[in-house]
Amino acid sequence: MKLKIPNILTIGRIIIVPIFVLTFFIPGFFGDLIPFFLFVLASFTDYLDGLLARIFKEESKLGELLDPIADKILVATALILLVMNGTIKNYEVIAAIIILTREILISGLREFLAKGQIDMQVTGLSKLKTFIQMLSIAILLTGEIGNKLINFQDYNAQTIGIILLWLSAFLTLYTGYDYLRKGIDHAIDQDTKEDR
């Protein structure tokens, strides 16, 4: 099977993740800079693969399968590493847990609804959620470099990143509820048909 360019980009995003993890543990300046650039590059391929698939009409079932998996691997890995090194700490960890829980929930819902041949369309709000999520993680990855570059009164890169992470968590709850409602409605509908 010949791989299409959007699929190659998606696979590339998955391949970036272990490199991202390894560079995260480099001490000092490069330990902040390299993971940041790798995460931004991987996030950009998420936008680019979808755009190219639509422009060149190269949307595929493989792309539909791999794209959300690649996103979840990237985001989950970044959040776990940021919690592990103390960038996300104390009550902020709740925001990370909300985001990760929603991703697991949606994966299960997609599989359940797919059996009923119901497509879970990505909404504009979900796309906004993803953008804010990626932006917050990217800012948090800048570490001390980001804090030196962005420092206005009580707001530095870390503070802005955490605020955006909480906003992302709120949008995650809202969009997750919408998907969950569709899943529950479908399950009730199926049970009703079986009881007849």
Range-by-range predicted roles:
Residues 1-7, 17, 27, 35-43, ...:
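C-terminal membrane-associated helical module and adjoining short loops/tails
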Residues 12-19, 70-79, 106-107, 129-141:
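Core segments of transmembrane alpha-helices
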Residues 14, 37-40, 69, 97-100, ...:
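Residue-level signature of the transmembrane alpha-helical core
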Residues 15, 44-52, 69, 73, ...:
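Active-site His/Glu-centered metal-binding helix of metallohydrolases
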Residues 16-65, 78-98, 156-171:
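Membrane-embedded alpha-helical segments that form the functional core of polytopic membrane enzymes
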Residues 54-59, 111-122:
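A cytosolic-side transmembrane-helix exit/cap motif
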Residues 104-112:
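Membrane-water interface of transmembrane alpha-helices
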